Amino acid sequence: MNKKVFAMTLGTALLAATTAFAGDLLVGGCIYKFDDTHMTNVRNSMKAEADALGIDLELQDSQNRQPLQNDQVDTFITKGVNALVLNPVDRTASAPLVDKAKAAGIPVVFINREPEADVIASYDKVFYVGARAEESGTQSGEMIVDYFKANPGADKNGNGKIEYIMLKGEQGHQDATLRTEYSQKAMRDGGFEIVELGSDNANWDKVQATDKMKGFISAVGIEHIEAILCNNDDMALGAIEALKAEGYNTGDPAKFIPVVGVDATAPALAAMADGSLLGTVLNDAKNQGIAAMRLAKLSAEGAEITNDAVGYEVTDGKYVWVPYVKVTQANYKDFQ
């Protein structure tokens, strides 16, 4: 081939490739920590939807450290991403991130951890995808109520009260607060007095939950514990490990304490199948991930954010609420 023709052909090809790349959307995502089971499911959904939409998605593990996440966001902004999808380590530290994105004209989609309303309102290109935590709390409490009504012997001392342990997410996390409050309310609304034998923050972590539960067992005696409510499945599974060490929740109906969690993760569904976990609540990671990536794409393109465009109901032009679903022994196989 003539060198001049080759050079022109190569130049044309490079220009075409550069143009094609320039037309792609680059989205930067930060997840508060990669080893959170639910957020692993969310980011897997995000990656699948990004591939389907032709988005170049770069994800960073913030390792549960807000300063690290701040640096990651700075790097993404310097890199010139078209949109950010953020799962903040500390939702109360979201304002500076929004300010930086706003100054650069970059849309921000928060997912799973909701910043304060004034932060979301501070920039017209900020959105939130999540679920209403009070729903999951209500459904968790209802499962305990249903169990006690169907199994009168669950009230070990026959005093008509549910004597329970509560394992919570991190201190100050909105979902932890609401799941706790509304699960307690649901038990009272179900006609029971409730007695909290112990409550502590296990920070969404299975190992911490096992340690906390062992402490409660030593403090109050396993024979007095009638129910265990956990703000997520990892903590529920951690609590079950502590129960199993005492010979409970291993198949003997006389040694069973109802435990409920939230998220409907694969390990939780497996625990439901073996009978060690009473129930959980589906925190729909798949649809949360899909909605987040669609919002990122539409906002980066300057498109109108409508229900039809996103494929989900958009509240106040900013919020996508993905409903929770109660997962019981009667329907858990539908979610496996």
Language model features by range: what are they?
Residues L25-S45, E49, L53, L57-T75, ...:
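Extracytoplasmic "Venus flytrap"
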Residues G160-E163, L167-Q171, D175, G289-Q336:
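Hinge/cleft segment of the Venus flytrap/periplasmic-binding protein
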Residues L86-A103, S183, L197-A271:
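Hydrophobic alpha-helical
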Residues M1-A22:
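Gram-negative bacterial Sec-dependent N-terminal signal peptides
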